[in-house]
Each structure stands twice: as C-alpha cells, then as structure tokens.
Design a protein with these regions (language model features):
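Non-catalytic terminal and connector segments of soluble metabolic enzymes
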Residues: 2-205
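Catalytic metal-binding acidic patch
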Residues: 209-213
Length: 213
C-alpha cells in the first residue's frame, strides 16, 4: 500500500459515521522531526524527553550554512498555509541566526491513531502530542520565541515522505549521525559521521549562539 493509499484509507474511516473522529491503524508510523537551531541549547534535553515518549531510531545534525533559508522553504513547499500572509518569511527571518545547525530525528509509533483537522488534514495524534509537549515545556525558554521556530514534526505518512526527501537532498551537510542498533537507516546514512550515541554530539550544540543576522 502506498503512502497516499494509506492516507486515503484513514480518511475514509474517519469520515464513516458522524461521530467517528479517531481511527486506529495497525501499521507503524515513522514521523520525522526537526529541532530548529533556535533551541540548540536544549537539543540534548529535548531529545532525551522525546526518547521517553517514543522510540527514537535515528538522529542527525545538519550544518546548513548558506543553504539554511532554502532548506526551510523546501520543508514547507507544499504547505499553503505557511505561505499565506508571508508567514514563512517571518519564520525564516526569526530563525536566521549566525548558527545554522539543526537536528533531524525519526521515531517509531506502533499502532498510531489519527484525527482529521478542520482543514481536512490527517494528523497522527501521537506525533502531535510529542510536538505539543516540547513546545509547551521549552517555548518560554527561547528568546523571542516565534510560533513553530522550535520543533517541526510530520503529521502523516505523506508529509513524512516529503520531509525525508528534503532532508536527504541536504545530506552533504551532515556533521553527526546516529542510527539505533539493530535498525536500518531511514535517512541517508553518512558513515563518516556515524556515532554510537546521539547524546554526545547533541551536547556539542549547547554552546551555539542564536544572534540574529
């Protein structure tokens, strides 16, 4: 079953019956998350909390340099809402600091549940819970916090696939890569940057400054 077929199947089940808002699907979901550079001081701490909530399978650090802005635009290319009113450009302006390092991670959700948003978008409930908890606990710690400039997590299979393709396009910027023992790499695997633990290379981000350019 393709990603689109899976999402269509979920959507049909959600729409069946006026009271049915949530559906279980017994396949696994592999949401892709991004910890934006604004939160690097807390990246290690946030990843450890995420690992308590869900099984983290892979963690990468990308140092995007001059291609940082284009990476953000590519991530939200299919998100019309992000472009309305110039929101995406305000987001980039807020996040465009002298530090261009981001953390990309993948985790596993077994037996995920889904809901349909008001705009019709299918959302993995467990993935959204991770995102909402991190925002709730860390938004107040970020100087000049601007909504969504801390963490991004894919909401469904199709969005995860698009994010995966985007991240893999920028694989040359990888400076750290961890794959959980016993699992195959989902993101492109950069063996030259391989690490047995993501805790150590995330620790190195704590000193990152976030002065706006």
């Amino acid at each position: 079953m393709t990603e689109k077929q899976l999402n269509d199947k979920i959507l049909c089940k959600i729409k069946k019956g006026d009271t049915m808002q949530v559906v279980k699907n017994h396949n696994s979901e592999y949401p892709i998350g991004i910890l934006w550079n604004m939160g690097n001081k807390y990246a290690r701490e946030m990843m450890l909390k995420i690992a308590i909530m869900e099984d983290v399978l892979q963690v990468k650090i990308l140092d995007l340099g001059k291609d940082y802005e284009q990476f953000v635009l590519d991530c939200y290319e299919r998100d019309e809402e992000a472009y309305e009113g110039g929101y995406i450009y305000e987001k980039i302006k807020n996040m465009n600091t002298d530090n261009k390092r981001i953390v990309v991670f993948i985790f596993n959700v077994d037996n995920p549940t889904y809901q349909q948003a008001e705009d019709g978008k299918i959302q993995c409930i467990e993935a959204r819970q991770v995102k909402q908890r991190i925002r709730k606990e860390y938004a107040s710690k970020i100087d000049e916090y601007f909504f969504d400039n801390l963490i991004h997590i894919s909401d469904n299979v199709e969005e995860a696939k698009r994010t995966l393709n985007t991240v893999n396009k920028y694989d040359k910027y990888t400076i750290g890569n961890y794959v959980r023992k016993g699992y195959k790499s989902i993101l492109n695997e950069s063996t030259k940057c391989q690490s047995k633990s993501y805790v150590s290379f995330l620790e190195n981000l704590r000193g990152d400054k976030d002065e706006r350019e």
